[in-house]
C-alpha cells in the first residue's frame, strides 16, 4: 500500500469511471470496507468529478496517510503548486469545530514534518456535504497555512477559483509530494 489509496491527474480522475476509482480505493483499504465508507467514497467521487472539472491540470490523491499520527486525509489536491486538504463529512450539515481542528491538525503536521510541504502554501478545507453556503476569506498565517475554508458539495470549485488567484507557487507534482520524506522532530531521548 502506498501513502495514498488513489492518486493521479485530475484529468485522469475525471475520465475514469466512478466504480473503477471506488474499486482502487477498496483494494488499497487494508480493513474490510464497510458500506458506510463505500458510500462516502462514492459521494466524494461524484462531488469532486463535478466540482474540480475546471482544474484538469491539477492532481488528486484520496486517503493520504499521515505517518506520525496514522490518520488519513480524505482528499489532497495540488493545483498550481498549492496544496489543498479536503476533509469530507458526507451527509453532515454543519461546519463543526472538531472537523476544522482535525483538518488543521493535518495541515500543521504536514507543514512541519513532510519535506515537500514545508515551503508550500497549504489550504485546509472542510466539506460537510449538506451544509449551507458560508462566505470564505483566504487568510494565510505566517507559516503559509490558510485558515480553514468551509465548503459544501456545491461550491468547492467556486471557492478554489476564488482563492487560487490570490496565491502563487512553483509547480509541484503529486508523485514528488507523495514520495517526499516524512521527518518528524526527534524526541528528547533520540536527540
Segments predicted by a language model, with ranges:
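Accessory nucleic-acid engagement/destabilization modules that flank
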Residues: 1-185
Amino acid at each position: 500500500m502506498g501513502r495514498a489509496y488513489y492518486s493521479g491527474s485530475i484529468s485522469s480522475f475525471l475520465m475514469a469511471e466512478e466504480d473503477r476509482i471506488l474499486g482502487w480505493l477498496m483494494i488499497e483499504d487494508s480493513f474490510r470496507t464497510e458500506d458506510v465508507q463505500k458510500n462516502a467514497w462514492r459521494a466524494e467521487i461524484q462531488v469532486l468529478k463535478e466540482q474540480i472539472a475546471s482544474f484538469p491540470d491539477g492532481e488528486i490523491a484520496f486517503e493520504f496517510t499521515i505517518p506520525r499520527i496514522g490518520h488519513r486525509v480524505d482528499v489532497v489536491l495540488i493545483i498550481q503548486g498549492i496544496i489543498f486538504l479536503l476533509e469530507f463529512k458526507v451527509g453532515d450539515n454543519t461546519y463543526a469545530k472538531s472537523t476544522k481542528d482535525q483538518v488543521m491538525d493535518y495541515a500543521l503536521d504536514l507543514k512541519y514534518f513532510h519535506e515537500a510541504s514545508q515551503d508550500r502554501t497549504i489550504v485546509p478545507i472542510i466539506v460537510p456535504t449538506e451544509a449551507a453556503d458560508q462566505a470564505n476569506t483566504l487568510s494565510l498565517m505566517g507559516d503559509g497555512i490558510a485558515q480553514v475554508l468551509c465548503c459544501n458539495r456545491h461550491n468547492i470549485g467556486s471557492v478554489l477559483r476564488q482563492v487560487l488567484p490570490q496565491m502563487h507557487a512553483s509547480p509541484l507534482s503529486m508523485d514528488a509530494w507523495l514520495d517526499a520524506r516524512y521527518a518528524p522532530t526527534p524526541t528528547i531521548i533520540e536527540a
